[in-house]
């Protein structure tokens, strides 16, 4: 039996765990908004290290060993049809400060 892949779109939002929307982390606000819009799925991935050409975040943590806190990179991945993902773009444009937003297409296969 040949595997059959389908087409989908994804939206990735790169930000930091210290970036807030109102009083909650931005990544939680994005997931909450995506859920309220009925998007197919979302995942938050916490990185252990990263860099960008521009400094993001309010206070840059030098090291967890020295300062006791950390500012780890966070990636929010949303998957759905492109027209559905576009519903969250106004929210991101208004509220996703210090973020990089990437949209693309992918092939997917769901396994049991």
PLM features: residue spans?
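Positively charged, small/polar-rich N-terminal and surface patches that mediate targeting and assembly
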Residues: 1-112
